[in-house]
Swiss-Prot record:
Protein name according to UniProt: Conotoxin Cal14.13b
Note on domains (UniProt): The cysteine framework is XIV (C-C-C-C).
Native source organism of the sequence: Californiconus californicus (California cone)
Signal sequence range: 1-20
Disulphide connectivity of cysteines: none
UniProtKB keywords: Amidation, Disulfide bond, Ion channel impairing toxin, Neurotoxin, Secreted, Signal, Toxin
Modified sites of kind Methionine amide: 66
Domain of life (superkingdom): Eukaryota
Subcellular location, record wording: Secreted
Entry comment on modification after translation: Contains 2 disulfide bonds.
Tissue expression pattern: Expressed by the venom duct.
Chain residues in the propeptide: 21-68
Main location: secreted
Function recorded in the entry: Probable neurotoxin with unknown target. Possibly targets ion channels.
């Protein structure tokens, strides 16, 4: 009898836990995807080889001012 009650309680708890977890993972995946997307459209057209993209502008200094 006790085992049956435990199983029912677990089944009742699962949708809430699963919903929370999936919401967290979806949010995480969404932020990862949007991060990739913004990184891709920073410089259009892409910078020539040897230059890095910073805030939409191409720069050939690898360790220049990060605060710009």
């Amino acid at each position: 009898m006790k085992l049956c009650v435990v199983i029912v309680l677990l089944m009742l708890a699962m949708p809430f836990n699963g919903g929370e977890a999936s919401r967290f993972f979806n949010q995480h995946a969404r932020s990862q995807r949007s991060g990739m997307k913004t990184r891709g459209i920073w410089c259009d057209p892409p910078c020539p080889e040897g230059e890095t993209c910073r805030g939409g502008e191409c720069s050939d200094e690898f360790n220049g001012d990060m605060g710009r």
